[in-house]
Amino acid sequence: MSTEQLPPDLRRVHMVGIGGAGMSGIARILLDRGGLVSGSDAKESRGVHALRARGALIRIGHDASSLDLLPGGATAVVTTHAAIPKTNPELVEARRRGIPVVLRPAVLAKLMAGRTTLMVTGTHGKTTTTSMLIVALQHCGLDPSFAVGGELGEAGTNAHHGSGDCFVAEADESDGSLLQYTPHVAVITNIESDHLDFYGSVEAYVAVFDSFVERIVPGGALVVCTDDPGGAALAQRATELGIRVLRYGSVPGETMAATLVSWQQQGVGAVAHIRLASELATAQGPRVMRLSVPGRHMALNALGALLAAVQIGAPADEVLDGLAGFEGVRRRFELVGTCGVGKASVRVFDDYAHHPTEISATLAAARMVLEQGDGGRCMVVFQPHLYSRTKAFAAEFGRALNAADEVFVLDVYGAREQPLAGVSGASVAEHVTVPMRYVPDFSAVAQQVAAAASPGDVIVTMGAGDVTLLGPEILTALRVRANRSAPGRPGVLG
């Protein structure tokens, strides 16, 4: 495609931290639209490899000379967020040369210009709800452009430049950057306390959602889950401002646009009965909504996606058909594999949950999977994410993890943060009352988990850090154990 489709300052872009979920998506869209892209990252990753295969020039490590990877040099340097150290040599060199340094949200806003924008935000469920919306619109033949914080199972990518006139994106609320956007349709899944390291107070965090809603374009709509107290309160405030609000949830009422009437787990999927407001559907009465992903929270996410899709003209029944084919998002209760142990199998899942509410929802889904299986236990390997979050939610993490039968707590994955005195995985472990092991030695965890597993168990690796690497290691250790106990028996099955 011609670079004429891109603003002049985005035709030759260098991206610092290009392999991350958000940055790699922007890079893909720039490449799809004919731009030249270079970048750097601290380490090799799936995202880095995929972008190289599409023509991006990427260097591991940070060096000022990386700005010259592209012929003619970069016209802009993009960073993930303001937390990138100002001493980063590439940013220092960009400023010395007078090359504009811009943040990812500003670039995404430019890429969405001129399109009907549908944006999903909230404390939990953003990535899954955004992905459901994308898959549903694709099924309806709309071919949306999209940028999402996870990898869609169906597409194997986190971003795409589509031929349609709509753009679907996940709006990150963690640092206020969602205020860069002016959506036509905004979906808010829920609002709970989080990211207090940036906002300083719950009140400030909640206020950013109000400000975001006020940026909805005239004639647009807010889609919000009112099962959540924070969402219900926001819906009321938005209504008072004259914003069109479409509420969804499980509590029926005259103001509800979509209601979850009933829901039943079926294997690793679910069947729900829903009711839509008369103005949203040609045929009245309960409808069946089938999903291939487990958990009541997934059914609510699907309702939000359904309402958003209908707002831009997608027929409700076609959207429901599309949602039935949604296969999930990488690292959202993703089945890593299965291993035969004794007379039953052990299933290993991986999940991105890093907030107490997310943990509770994921463990509820795991319980439902167990009820459909061989009656094993629920084992969790939890890695706290960020020292500030661990300090704020240590007790809540412990209480949420108590829904498991056995818990392995790792040390904190600090990411961008420096350690805080007195804060570690032990801060969480002391609040866990079910059988628990605190294992600060990351290299020792897989063997311990595999040794503790029993036939029929479900194991969930959980957190936003590198705990995701443990799933395959646990499966390998389980296979070795199975082969030792029954020579010649098949090991990992999936």
UniProtKB/Swiss-Prot annotation:
Function: Cell wall formation.
Gene Ontology terms for molecular function: ATP binding; UDP-N-acetylmuramate-L-alanine ligase activity
Coiled-coil ranges per UniProt: none
GO BP term (any one): cell wall organization
GO terms for cellular component: cytoplasm
Organism of derivation: Mycobacterium bovis (strain ATCC BAA-935 / AF2122/97)
Compartments reported by the entry: Cytoplasm
Swiss-Prot/TrEMBL keywords: ATP-binding, Cell cycle, Cell division, Cell shape, Cell wall biogenesis/degradation, Cytoplasm, Ligase, Nucleotide-binding, Peptidoglycan synthesis
Catalytic activity from the UniProt record: UDP-N-acetyl-alpha-D-muramate + L-alanine + ATP = UDP-N-acetyl-alpha-D-muramoyl-L-alanine + ADP + phosphate + H(+)
Residues the entry annotates as binding ATP: G122, T123, H124, G125, K126, T127, T128
Pathway: Cell wall biogenesis; peptidoglycan biosynthesis
InterPro entries: Mur-like_cat_sf, Mur_ligase_C, Mur_ligase_C_dom_sf, Mur_ligase_cen, Mur_ligase_N, MurCDEF_pg_biosynth, UDP-N-AcMur_Ala_ligase_MurC
Domain of life: Bacteria
Designated name of the protein: UDP-N-acetylmuramate--L-alanine ligase
Major enzyme class: ligase
Stated family: Belongs to the MurCDEF family.
EC number, as in UniProt: 6.3.2.8
Main location: cytoplasm
